[in-house]
Amino acid sequence: DGAVVLDASAAPGALSLEALPRGADPAMLCERDRDAAAVIERNIAALRLGRDRARLLPGDVLKRGAAAPGRPFDLIFLDPPYATDPAEVFGLLSRLDAADALAADLIVSYEHDASDDDAVETLAETSGYEIASRRHFGDTTLDLLERLCTE
């Protein structure tokens, strides 16, 4: 309950918007595509969610990062375009960590091309994450990452 959610590459916002009635609060949705961002804005408005509960940040979160809304992120959804280098994804996590924007018990849901499995495993290990769960759906992999204890 009360988990702070970051939904990077959010279009159409379904994951984070569905997390809100399940106890998440707030959700930050990031989307670089203008048309997709407009769909997210319409979805937020249709659900009558105020900016205190769901906020759209247009632009490329992988390039610029995102500031946590007063509390660190507990849950991050990452579903970037499959051509995205996994190093960019782990770079975002590193920048968020350096900004103290990640909860100690953070969970990351990372969907990526299955051909990147080895790179993701290596980057997770060297970045302080473990793959707690991995599922394959055709050419797609869904990893649930957890932070390793650093103390």
Task: Map each language-model feature to its residues.
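Class I S-adenosyl-L-methionine-dependent methyltransferase catalytic core
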Residues: D1-E151
